[in-house]
């Protein structure tokens, strides 16, 4: 047997052990498959209660293998236990106390890191930095692009507004022209209506004037003594004298003619 080879492990590690389980109970169950050297149920250093697992050490490896094969996944003291070969040597109570206080110290964790883990960490950190840089660059580009788009939109908006105003102004002018035309037509219709309403009055007044003028002329013909309008008193006197002389001459002629008959 070489000095570098270790003796075969004869200890079994048992999980899911009930709190009420005693070492005598485990010794009775496992002692069926061979002589047992030691049974150990670790207790909590502060509460003094079982921690839920136990160790059973046999004298022969073949006995330990038989116990593992027959009792694994079996019900012992009200629980289904799991059995496997223990890894490492049995720890002392002082080692268990330090393990409970410091289950995994950061210094041990740092020391236990392998160079490959350190390399992967450095790579992951560099990858994270590169990713952050790329994200920041993307954000800056996105901001610039959005800013340029907002600028272009702000520049294009006034042009659209001016074009919209230019396109709207002719409509307003057309509307004002239509309104002015409608107003002028209304004024013309009103003036025509007024003229039509005033024309009958004028006609009636002209008719009354013509009638009065005819009556006046008849009165002048009947009464020659009255002076018509537009003649002076001397002219009227001369005309009346001539008219009377003509009447007297015609009467004398008619009288002579009668006497001749």
Curated annotation (Swiss-Prot):
Keyword Membrane: no
Amino acid composition bias (Basic and acidic residues), ranges on this chain: 88-109
Gene Ontology MF terms in the entry: RNA binding; RS domain binding; unfolded protein binding
Pfam families found in the cross-reference section: RRM_1
Primary location recorded for the protein, binned into one broad class: nucleus
Residue ranges of every copy of the RRM domain listed in the record: 10-88
Basic residues bias spans: 110-122, 178-191, 240-261
GO terms classed as biological process: mRNA 5'-splice site recognition; mRNA splicing, via spliceosome; negative regulation of mRNA splicing, via spliceosome; regulation of alternative mRNA splicing, via spliceosome; spliceosomal tri-snRNP complex assembly
Low complexity: compositionally biased ranges: 192-209
Keywords: mRNA processing, mRNA splicing, Nucleus, RNA-binding
GO cellular component, one term: nuclear speck
Cross-referenced InterPro entries: Nucleotide-bd_a/b_plait_sf, RBD_domain_sf, RBM, RRM_dom
Gene3D superfamilies in alphabetical order: 3.30.70.330
Region annotated Disordered, chain positions: 86-261
Protein localization: Nucleus
UniProt tissue specificity: Expressed in testis.
Function: Splicing factor that seems to antagonize SR proteins in pre-mRNA splicing regulation.
Family: Belongs to the splicing factor SR family.
Name of the featured protein: Serine/arginine-rich splicing factor 12
Source organism of this protein record: Homo sapiens (Human)
